[in-house]
UniProtKB/Swiss-Prot annotation:
Region Disordered: start-end pairs: 413-432
Species whose genome carries this gene: Danio rerio (Zebrafish)
Protein name: Monoacylglycerol lipase ABHD2
Gene3D superfamilies from the UniProt entry: alpha/beta hydrolase (3.40.50.1820)
Similarity-based family: Belongs to the AB hydrolase superfamily. AB hydrolase 4 family.
Stretches of the chain found on the membrane's Cytoplasmic side: 1-14
């Protein structure tokens, strides 16, 4: 009896210690997963810049210090590209303003009706000039999206007029007037908007801005024809993928949950297309019932592009559609200053695609490629610990770069004029 009692009393005190060890192990495991998922150990750093050693680029970096300073995302979650992207996708922006604009309607030759919203500046531009931002949003987006409203409001307050394209078919309350909607690289509507701005405001200089898919469209537009670059001071592209053909393979991979994002975007595209089902699949349309059936079962953007989107412009195959609608074949024709912005942790743009802007910046002196460690896809939120600020790093860097270009245009040395034949060394001597 005494032996049993002694055994009981020697074992019992060890049980809580064992359970405490299990709890500690569980807590440690959870913390490890949190640290890994939130990428908390990742450092903050300035953007990795690729550019050539020119007088203009040195002026831009000096006048736009945000490009050389650390981008610091919110401490607890801002280093996760997935959370940055999710917050952008769900909320767009925090405490988004409501800028007031006028909607314009432009009839197209094929019967379609392009629409864009025009926002006048809320202050004088510091250069004293009339400057207009011509803005192309991301896939299926329009002027009413929160991230667009935030950017427009910030630009207006800095003295910029803003014209925002509404992608054909994207606005929920605007019916299509022809059996065609926006595609990955069709520049017709953007060209119509730019033409309207140039005609209505003949003294205005243009800043071209594109977000994600919009970045592809604006770069393709500028590279398609040299006349498209007239009166354009510069162009900024944020979070685009440059080549749909090369991106196609990566979008089918589960790495960085890219296949899941592909499914979500495909589902959103289906909703947009089906909201215009009567026009797109009705009388006079090239679409047939079998294509509508395949749309219902599509689980990827590639399936939708192959069954629906490529046929709006008569492309014979998905490969042909992606090749002809990607800016990678046109971007080298852009001669105005060009800022390309991407993020390492963007779950939608595979790192292999970033060789395109990096190589371009190494070869062309008008191009600056800025690659941030964090920011996700069109996130770039800033904040101390938990709550993000309404204005993002992305909003600031675009406006600061545009303002620096306006300053350069006003005070650039004679050797930097388009007709000048002076070499770079002479120019550097004149500006030193």
């Amino acid at each position: 009896m005494n032996t049993h009692e002694s055994e009981v009393y020697t074992v019992a005190p060890e049980m809580p210690a064992m359970f405490d060890g299990m709890k500690l192990a569980a807590v440690a495991t959870v913390l490890y997963v949190i640290v890994r998922c939130l990428n908390l150990k990742s450092p903050t750093a300035p953007p990795d810049l690729t550019f050539q050693d020119t007088t203009l680029n040195h002026f831009l970096l000096k006048s736009c210090p945000i490009l050389t300073k650390e981008y610091i995302p919110p401490l607890l979650w801002g280093k996760s590209g997935h959370l940055q992207t999710a917050l952008y996708g769900k909320l767009g922006r925090v405490s988004s303003p409501h800028p007031f604009g006028l909607r314009k309607y432009l009839p197209m030759q094929d019967g379609a009706t392009a629409t864009f919203d025009l926002f006048e500046p809320l202050a004088d531009h510091q250069s004293g000039e009339d400057v207009t931002m011509v803005i192309c949003p991301g896939i299926g987006n329009h002027s009413e999206k929160h991230y667009i409203r935030t950017f427009v409001d910030h630009s207006q307050k800095q003295g910029y007029r803003c014209a925002v394209l509404n992608h054909l078919g994207a606005l929920p309350n605007i019916e299509l007037t022809s059996p065609r909607m926006f595609t990955y690289g069709c520049t017709w509507e953007f060209a119509a908007m730019v033409g309207f701005i140039k005609k209505t405001y003949p003294q205005s200089k243009l800043i071209v801005v594109g977000f994600s898919l919009g970045g592809n469209i604006v770069c393709k537009f500028l590279g398609e024809n040299r006349t498209n670059q007239e009166r354009v001071l510069c162009c900024v592209s944020v979070c685009q993928g440059y080549s749909a053909l090369r991106a196609q393979e990566t979008f089918l991979q589960w790495d960085q949950c890219r296949r899941f994002y592909n499914f979500l975007m495909a589902d959103n595209m289906k909703k947009i297309i089906l909201s215009h089902r009567g026009v797109l699949f009705g009388v006079g349309s090239k679409m047939v019932d079998s294509e509508l059936s395949r749309l219902y079962t599509a689980t990827s953007l590639m399936q939708i592009d192959d069954n629906i989107m490529r046929k709006f412009h008569g492309h014979n195959s998905l490969k042909e559609y992606y090749e002809k609608e990607s800016c990678v074949h046109y971007i080298h024709n852009i001669n105005v200053p060009l800022l390309l912005v991407n993020s390492v942790d963007d779950p939608l743009v595979h790192n292999s695609l970033l060789t395109i802007p990096r190589t371009l910046a190494e070869k062309k002196e008008n191009v600056v490629f800025a690659l941030t460690l964090h920011g996700g896809h069109l996130g770039f939120f800033e904040g101390a610990v938990l709550f993000p600020q309404p204005l993002t790093w992305m909003d600031k860097v675009i406006v600061d770069y545009a303002t620096a270009m306006c300053q350069w245009e006003k005070q650039k040395p004679p050797c930097q004029s388009k007709d000048a034949q002076s070499n770079q060394t002479t120019c550097q001597e004149n500006t030193s």
